[in-house]
Every structure is written in C-alpha cells, then in structure tokens.
C-alpha cells in the first residue's frame, strides 16, 4: 500500500511540473502570436510583443523601442504609459519608473537602482519602485525556474 501511495505522490509532483512547463510553453507561444497595435499619424502599426524591448514616456508621447529582423527601431505615438501597461499586463512588462515600462525578456541584470538590458541600455529604477521590482523579478524568475 505504501508503494502505491509513493507512486501516486511522485505522479502528482510530476504532473504539477508538467503543468507548469506547459503553462510556460503556452505563454511563450502566446507571446509569439500576439502583437501590440498603435496608431501613429494615419498609420496603424503592429509590433510582435516578443520584439518590444521597452516603452518610454516623454511629454504626451510614448516611444516604443523594439528589435525586428535583428535591427533596432523606435517609433512614437500619443498615449499614456498607464494604458500601455494595462494592455500588456499578462506579458511580464515591468514598470520600473514613471517613464519606463520594460519587457522582462530583455533585462540582462537587475541592480539596486537600475536595470541593464541585453541591448546595452541602462535604465533607472525609481526609488519608490525598487522593492516592488525586486518582488516581481523574484516571482518571474521563480516561475521560469520551475
């Protein structure tokens, strides 16, 4: 009887791990399929979420920084960073500062007061956001390591 309980326990643990792996896989596939859409002038532009590095707010404009076909691009549109953040809530973007919304996939290193992106760019973390960013970073890393 104990042997059957052990097998059941092992299967349950493995089932949890398998479910988490599938969740991560689905999330990544979801990332590849989804795009961020915005209007600039008379054009409507669609950028794959996976290509977006970060958003920057300047006056009433949002500057979107992204890579596509191994080239760095930036574009701008009118809007609020709060609205962009809500729109991308399920895609692991971190609001590190009132002017920056960073895609977690492009963060190479977190320091106390800044993030280092894989593109070589350094962005400041607002003092009021440091504790929250560390907690979010820990949660994301924990999800990815399971």
What are the language-model segments listed below?
Residues 138-146:
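Short, charged, intrinsically disordered terminal tails
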Residues 17-118:
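Conserved binding/recognition cores within well-folded domains
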Residues 134-136:
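Short, surface-exposed, low-complexity cationic segments
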Residues 1-18:
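Output/docking surface of receiver
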């Amino acid at each position: 009887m104990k042997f059957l309980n052990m097998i059941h326990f092992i299967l349950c643990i493995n089932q949890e791990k398998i479910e988490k792996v599938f969740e991560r896989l689905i999330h990544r596939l979801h990332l590849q399929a989804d795009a961020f859409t915005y209007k600039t002038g008379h054009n409507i532009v669609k950028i794959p979420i996976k290509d977006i590095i970060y958003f920057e707010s300047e006056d009433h404009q949002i500057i979107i920084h992204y890579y596509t076909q191994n080239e760095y691009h930036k574009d701008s549109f009118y809007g609020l960073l709060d609205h962009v953040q809500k729109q991308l809530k399920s895609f692991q973007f971190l609001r590190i500062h009132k002017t920056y919304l960073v895609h977690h996939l492009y963060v190479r290193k977190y320091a106390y007061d800044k993030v280092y992106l894989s593109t070589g760019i350094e962005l400041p973390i607002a003092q009021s956001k440091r504790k929250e960013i560390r907690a979010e970073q820990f949660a994301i890393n924990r999800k990815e390591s399971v």
